[in-house]
């Protein structure tokens, strides 16, 4: 295939040098912000402070022009996309909110998070021409609720 769309899945430990190399090679990233739900409590103990600060650089990837797609890697974490969007936007764990924001420099806007979940994922699977068929009806307007409310959005119909 002439139009390969190579990607790295589980790129939460990619450092800035590796991210620059991904950009140079046109490699996309399929990442799981929701992993912070569990990892936020253990990442510094397991990796040390320096490596912790060089992990979960998903917004850095995005800002450098790397195509970033979101996934949950269910059943590792719950499949609920609103939990993932919440974590990408807040940098907080739903399980351990008392631990605060993981990295304030790596927070996505709502528009960016939705792009990573929709348009980019369609592109990654060569399905960008199909995205007009999908819809969901939810109990809250995601554009008019607080970041904290996003994690509680319920799908009413799909």
Q: Each predicted region: which residue ranges?
A:
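His/Asp/Glu-enriched, well-ordered alpha-helical/loop segment
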Residues: 1-6, 11, 16-142, 153-158
């Amino acid at each position: 295939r002439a139009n390969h769309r190579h990607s790295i899945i589980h790129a939460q430990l990619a450092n800035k040098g590796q991210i620059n190399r991904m950009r140079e090679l046109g490699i996309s990233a399929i990442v799981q912000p929701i992993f912070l739900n569990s990892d936020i409590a253990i990442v510094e103990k397991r990796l040390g402070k320096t490596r912790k600060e060089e992990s979960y650089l998903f917004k850095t990837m995005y800002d450098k022009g790397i195509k970033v797609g979101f996934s949950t890697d269910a059943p590792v974490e719950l499949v609920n996309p609103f939990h993932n969007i919440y974590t990408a936007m807040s940098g907080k764990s739903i399980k351990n909110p008392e631990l605060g924001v993981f990295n304030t420099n790596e927070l996505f806007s709502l528009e960016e998070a939705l792009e990573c979940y929709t348009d980019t994922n369609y592109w990654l699977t060569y399905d960008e021409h199909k995205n007009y068929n999908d819809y969901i009806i939810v109990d809250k307007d995601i554009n008019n609720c607080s970041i904290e409310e996003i994690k509680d959005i319920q799908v009413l119909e799909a």
